[in-house]
Amino acid sequence: FRSGTVFHLFPMIRLSDILLSYAEAMHHAYGMSADPEGYGLTAIEAVQKIRTRAGFGTNDKFLNGVTDNNFMEKVKQERRIELCFEEHRYFDLRRWMDGNQLKEPIIGMKVEENASGLHYTRITVDEARNFKDYMYYHPIPLKVIKESPYIQQNPGW
């Protein structure tokens, strides 16, 4: 945004997010190691590019033994790590229809200092979470439904 004569550049989407979305789409369309349309990057190469940039280099064992059957689990794990603190997780879980993970309690860490140093204790931060199947989809605004007789509200809303 612009403030007086100074420009502030703020990234709306990072290259890692683009590459992980690309890897997910390529995997669903062609598998993890095919690029039949000639886009220049397979799904597995997109993930490797992120891992290389992060400093894992050529000896990275993260993708060892990966197959088309378990590749998406690796993409999900990489998104969780690479995009942590960027508020993608909730929407990723909804897109993947993995809402059951949203029902699990949130676990935090209580850190206390004592004579021998720091002591870490796992604590439950929130256990009353509720996620129903209808929550995978947003409700359609009532105004939109009233304007068209062909549009119906998403189930559950």
Kindly label every feature range from the protein language model.
Residues 1-157:
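Acidic/polar-rich alpha-helix caps and helix-coil junctions
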